Amino acid sequence: MVEVRKGNFFQRWLYRNYRQGSALGNFFSRRIRPTAWLWMGLGGLSVITGADLRQSVVVAFSLLMLGVLAVGLIWALLRRAQVVATRDLPDTGSVGEELSYFVNVTNVGKRALREIHFREQGDDPRPTEWEFLNLKEPGEEDRNIFDRALAYYRWKWLNERGGKWQSLGRSKVLNLGGGESEEVRLKLIPKRRGVLVLDDLRVELPDPFGLFQRCRPTGNEVGEILVIPRRYKLPPLDLGGQSDLKIGGETASTVKGEGGEFMGLRGYRPGDSPRHMHWKAWARTGEPIVKEFEEVRFPRYGLVLDTNLRGSGPELFEEAISVAASFVSSMDQERCLLDLMFVSDEPSVFTAGRGVAKADRLMEILARADGNDEGGYDLLNSLVLRYATEMTSCVVVLTGWDEEREEFVGSLRQSGMKVHLYVIGAGEMPEEEGLLGAHWIRWDAVQEDLMKSA
């Protein structure tokens, strides 16, 4: 379980100052190129060493550098651009996997644009106050007391991993005459699941020396990409159950249809599909006749996701989503059915498998799933038990461990259902009776612990 802290006044003051300072630094870094910082550093050094006006060479060099910087800055500020852009985006992406797309840009102005670039402004990487107060940089406990108190390295670490997506640089150099269009390729890496919004494509207008650049917005529509959760590699799964065949259609099964071979003809029974009617035999006998097939029966599994954030927090919830997505992508749904169960605004069940829906549908649902910090486990417990008799076994993914969750798991086990329990937690697994047979997955070592869970 992750201990939730509200933080003291000093920590909240640090957060506000780091956040404001980061915004200011980001503004200048977009407009001042590294070469300009180098020139300004050399200029300052030459001023210090050239304090003696008799050293005419140093003075001349200082004035030259100052002049170049001034010309470059004024040039960049005076550049203008009228550009319209249209993105050609893929429907989906995946967390942690590079994604590329094309943008058609048009210079709607009369003046030609030379040596320009295009860049999608990345998502704000700054952490929330909750993240700054409650998440620790790996190895933070080994730092000295000064670094721990100021939490600068924690802020830096959170920024490196923050934001929903990260831009991978700018486009190639373009030269656009008035009214001309060209297609450019841009890349990014999604860092969080959900709907990725692209709404700030900028054209960069540098000065001739490459010291400064002006960043102007383009006329563009908002683009969206659905980012599915990160998926981890799982060891071989043995959840029990296998598909089998049953002759006839009298016994109810999970999936009915022409999955098996044709067996023969029989008389019509109420409920038989019109698609199975044998019209020639009906015309010959005068009685409705239907074709009979072997009925394929598939095992049905439950995948129960804990969306309760109490005592855990968003980080553990995100890893629980990824673990659930890993199970969805790993199961052979041509040979089974999979019920995804969780509680959002209300108890929900989504089924994928042969004859129902594809796994992609469950991935989209997981990409949009939200956590909540209200309510207990009564609704989820009732939902799972309602389908217990239909399920071969059930995979339960929890976002922490406490008394409420222990009672929930105990209720499922008492029903006679075979439960495969995965608990996303912090630190080592507590020695508790309710966790016997469970797979404890540390939120910061998910892949390693999943491979040990075989």
Could you tell me what each predicted segment is?
Residues M1-T86:
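Extracellular/lumenal glycan-associated context and N-glycosylation machinery
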Residues R5-R30, R170, G249, S253-I289, ...:
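Long hydrophobic alpha-helices with heptad-repeat/coiled-coil character
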Residues F9, R33-T35, V71, A151-Y153, ...:
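Acidic, low-complexity intrinsically disordered regions
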Residues Q11, L234, E287, E432-E433:
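Intrinsically disordered, low-complexity regions
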Residues L14, L38-M40, E131, K280, ...:
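Short linear interaction motif-like sites in intrinsically disordered regions of transcription factors
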Residues G67-F350, S393-V397, S411:
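An amphipathic, basic-hydrophobic helix/alpha-beta surface used to engage anionic
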Residues S329-A454:
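Acidic, glycine-rich A-domain
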